[in-house]
Amino acid sequence: MQRNRWGRWFAGVAVISLVVIGCAKSSGATTPPAASTGAASSGPAASGGAAPAGSATAAAATCKGDGSKGEVKLMINQWVGAAANVAVAQCLLQQMGYKVTTSTLAEEVAWQGFQTGEVDVILENWGHPDLEKKYIQTDKLAQDAGPNGVTGIIGWYVPGWMIDKYPDLADWHNLNKYADLFKTSESGDKGQFLGSDPTFVQYDEALIANLHLNFKDVFSGSEAATITAFQQADKNKTALIGYFYDPQWLQSEIKLVQIHLPAYTPGCDADLKKVACDYPPYVLNKIVRTKWLDGAGDAGTFVKNFKWANADQNSVADAITNKNMSPEDAAKQWIDANPTKWAAWMP
């Protein structure tokens, strides 16, 4: 965040703060284990059918519970899709009788919470092999709790109007040809490549260097600031290239086109200093604290079973971002509309 010098950063912090407050409304956010350094097209999720019987209430009239079954500490990643995951899980866990507390943390910082006991569950992990090796394989402090059902795509994107005007821009070989279009006061005599939150999974600086591109990586500082930049570039027909991903509700609001980088092959990103290939597709998974899982009971079973599709996450994220709904209300709306989906998560 500290590297960002854009005025839009302040708006991004405000958006993220609202998401945090909404998600923590029922039980309050926990103190972070360390100082923090700071989701596909949206649409209605498929309706389920008759409300099932189960450990949670049949309808989400309220997300309240008595907290008698113990505490679950959920981590919220710094993007709205992750807030959608937590909002739905929090509501259902509270209905099951658990007290749920939440923390909003940078990805790497969150893993430290497995050691301190301040984080029990990460519901969306975007591939951190170094952290997985340390906390899962070596220290045995955490475990893989299976996929969350969402497939993540990271890449380089430009507004659709640019491809309409410059069709060959979609091929990375031609990026230097158009570098001057992307120059800003931040990038000097090079084209600007807009990075996002510096804590996200990314190796754009290495890609730029290893592909010999005349660009400079400039961080926006947050997801919210990146979204604003793409919205303005689409509206004002200004040039922009940057790091973005799917699932993310913005993909349905404006046309974004992914740049064709050298194709990903297994192992091409083994040395991130030498990487010269596209990002891999990510089968997003859940990570849980081992000591918590050992005594988690029904909550542990629920977390292992938690699995929904990109469209489900997008519908909740869209409601939070574009329909002025609190995370809790957006979660209740999805829960009411999809009883057969969340029933499959119940012990």
Regions from the PLM with identified roles:
Residues 119-123, 192-268:
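Ligand-binding pocket segment of bilobal, Venus flytrap-like solute-binding proteins
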Residues 141-193:
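A conserved helix-loop-strand patch within extracytoplasmic ligand-binding domains
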Residues 67-81, 98-103, 190-194, 303:
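Short, well-ordered beta-strand elements
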Residues 65, 86, 105-141, 227-231, ...:
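Pocket-flanking alpha-helical
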Residues 154-165, 281-295, 318-319:
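A bilobed periplasmic-binding-protein/Venus flytrap-type ligand-binding module shared by bacterial periplasmic
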Residues 77-80, 98-113, 218-229:
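Short helix-initiation/N-cap motifs at beta->coil->alpha
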Residues 56-87, 106-108:
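Extracytoplasmic "Venus flytrap"
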Residues 23-32, 40, 46:
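Bacterial lipoprotein signal-peptidase II cleavage site
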